[in-house]
Every structure is written in structure tokens, then in C-alpha cells.
């Protein structure tokens, strides 16, 4: 019985440790304002000396109440991210946020956040949103979609491919997203696959997408933009 309890305890500790490592590390003090000028390189950013911290380290005049320009985006969207690189006080706090503006028929293209879960609420307009599950045993990737209206909330699980689309022909939309990391990261699928530097071999992509290399060469020749600011 003692051996059984020992192995059970060991398994539990391993599980807890795994969960702890699956998100940003917890702070060990009241705050750890990022010192962006430190030569130290760690998994995150080192702390500024507490005596040098001021209230402005926790403040950013981000103008998130103002509409952002979507006209320069082929996707028809503009993501204004507030992460630790813009607001040093977020360091070790496991949170960031973004304002997302969508032109009529604009979208935030399929992408993932490798280090964060996202919760999104619609402030203006309507959005068609969804995410796709990881590879399943039945070889199906299930798609979950929903049309959101003003005030609605939707959550995108960490690391899963997801998107938002404004279905209106004449009305813009606005959303606010909160993310469970000070630096959630974003991988826009089309940009990463077709617009990487240097490019992925067209032999690889042609076989992966089961099309000819001419189609792949055309896709890789397009301009793949970043709609995140």
C-alpha cells in the first residue's frame, strides 16, 4: 500500500509540475517590472530594481478607445496588442490584451497563440468566429464556430488555430481580447507557411497541400502581411 501511495503521489506531483510549466511562471514578489535594458537573457524579462519603479511602469496611453486603421491591411483588420514589450508592468503577470478592428468583410486570419488562451468580447458589430481542434484519433480536425453579437464572449483554447470574420458588407466591427500570457505570440498560418524567410521548399509544400509546384510558387510570391501592431 505504501508503495502504491508513493507512486500515486509521484504521479500527482509530476502532473502539477507539468501544469505549472504550461503557463507563464508565477511572480515571487508584488511585481517584476521588466528591465528591457538588462543584458541578462532569461525565459521572460529580468526585474527592474524595485526602487526605480514608478507608477508609469504600470500605465500606457494606448488610445484603445480610438478606431484603428484597417485600410492598409489586405486582411481588413488591425490588431493592437498590449504585451510586456509595450507595458513593462505586465512582466510575470501572465496577461496581455488587444483591440481588434475589422473592416466590413475584414478578418483576423487563421492563427494561433502558442503561449496563451484567448477570451474575446465584441464591442461593436458582429463577428463569425471559430477554432479547429488538434489532430484526432479519427483523423478529423473538428471545427467549432459561432456568430457573436455586441456583448458576446468567446474563448479560444491555447495553441489552437482560430479566426474572426466580420460578415457585414457595410459596418465595421471591434473586439477586445484578453490573453493568458504577458507575451502570447501569434503564428498566422498562411504567413508562416507561404511567407517564411527563407521560403519552405515548394517540393515540401506541393506534396503537403497535394497541388502542383506552380500553384505553390504563386502562393509564395504573394505579399504576406502582418496585421498585428
Swiss-Prot record:
Residue span(s) of domain Cupin type-1: 62-217
Entry-linked InterPro entries: Cupin_1 (IPR006045), Germin (IPR001929), Germin_Mn-BS (IPR019780), RmlC-like_jellyroll (IPR014710), RmlC_Cupin_sf (IPR011051)
Residues bound to Mn(2+): 111, 113, 118, 162
The organism's place on the tree of life at top rank: Eukaryota
GO CC field: apoplast
Family annotation (Pfam families): Cupin_1
Location of the protein in the cell: Secreted, Extracellular space, Apoplast
Subunit and interaction comment: Oligomer (believed to be a pentamer but probably hexamer).
Similarity section: Belongs to the germin family.
Protein name as catalogued: Putative germin-like protein 12-4
Native species: Oryza sativa subsp. japonica
